[in-house]
Amino acid sequence: MLRLILLSAAALSVTASAASAETIRWARAGDSITLDPHAQNEGPTHALAHQMYDGLLQRDMSGAIIASLATEWAALAENPNVWRFKLREGVTFHDGAAFDSEDVVFSLNRAKQEGSEMQELLASVVDVRAVDAYTVDMETAGANPLMINNLTNMFMMDKGWAEANDVVMPQNVTAGETNYATMNTNGTGAFMLVSRSVDEKTVLKANPNYWGKDLYPTEVS
């Protein structure tokens, strides 16, 4: 829900037309703790991450769960412990890399690692596996109909980008760690990082290749 509220305010004001850019300034009581999408599980950090990263699912303005990077999802009839997700095709990360099932498997496993405060949301997950390039199965220890509620803040990272920048493991904020993802991003979201000064200012720009640009208003006249 936070994502859509912010998109309706921020994205609406980011571009007035193709020839005339507008800027919106968004003041908050507290800054994001980190840009690493799997390090912290708290409101201000998620609110900023939602602008640059997407989850498999999201919430609409009423709070209902709707499609995001996954277009279909259901527990398998033959095994209710397994959730199957059909992924959105044609999505790219901000650097142009294609999004596929390998990124989902990587991201969910990364969020389960020691030091990630997101791991509690995936505590019942015992396996995540790619069925094909755009299908992922997530198996839980028992039938878990509430699991999809935990996926709206579970952001998808580019596996290749993470490996290239040595951020396969999430930042452990409690231990005082920092990593490349602390100050840099590469998501599939509506906005791209331009610059960041912690506790002062974070500057974003519209993602011209955003997969959802035809679903949400991005121009104002």
Per-region residue spans from a language model:
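Aromatic- and charge-enriched surface segment that lines or borders ligand/interaction sites
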Residues: 72-117, 131, 137
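Short, solvent-exposed loop/turn elements at domain surfaces
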Residues: 33-38, 64-66, 94, 146-149, ...
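Short, well-ordered beta-strand elements
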Residues: 22-33, 71, 81-85, 104-108, ...
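Gly/Pro-rich hinge or "lid" segments in bacterial periplasmic/extracellular proteins
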Residues: 155-215
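Gram-negative bacterial Sec-dependent N-terminal signal peptides
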Residues: 1-20
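N-terminal lobe/hinge region of extracytoplasmic solute-binding protein
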Residues: 27-78, 109, 186-188
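Extracytoplasmic/secreted envelope proteins and their assembly/folding machinery
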Residues: 21, 32, 49-53, 66, ...
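Surface-exposed binding/hinge segments that line
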Residues: 86, 120-170
